[in-house]
Amino acid sequence: MFKDKINVQAIGTLKISDKETGTVLVDKRNAIHPGNMAYIMASALGGKPTSVNSSGSSPYINWMAFGNGGSSSTTTISYRSPRVFTTYDGLPITSSNSTLYSKTYQQEVVSTVYAPGEDMGGGNLVPENTSKVNFKVEMSHSEYEAMQQLSDPSITTPATDSSTDTTSVTAFTFDEIGLLAGVSTPTGMDETKTLMVTHVTFHPVLLSANRTIVVDYTITVQLS
């Protein structure tokens, strides 16, 4: 008996860790943008561009964006809701509500696709009817600093977590991340042709000079 209808489930997980010590700084699920994800998957299957990049190629996730608008703290920390919606509004991140609250940085990802039954390492096998995509970023101190200096040339990378330079500490602290289906250019990413696919908010993390931060963002696609 064949199935003419299947259920598709997409699950996103985020892990942020210190490369040198192996300390896990953040480990949680993230929110998928249903409207954008459905449209991007359909466009990719059909080999067609999205409406925000009508003269380009079919979309895929190739950028990770970081921001500092995902949480607030007074006596206790509170997290803002991920900006994901069930509809596709046809707008790029420059004019859509489907974007980070306060984007401060973006970096291209290194992606790895795992097939059903494939070993992801350590005997961790991908289940049947399932594939996983891992998007990895080892955050660049120099690129992050250069982007912050566009708005304030005095900003430098904080030496440690205990740095007293509050301006630099604020600039190098992030508490939200999104995966983007973007358009790469020789100078970076064209935001006017880019869509956000996922969004997650979490407690603030500081990118200091004595710490190398690695971000592993995994999307699991399962059919049943």
Where are these regions (language model features)?
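Small cysteine-rich, disulfide-bonded extracellular modules of the LU/uPAR three-finger superfamily
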Residues: M1-F174, G182-S224
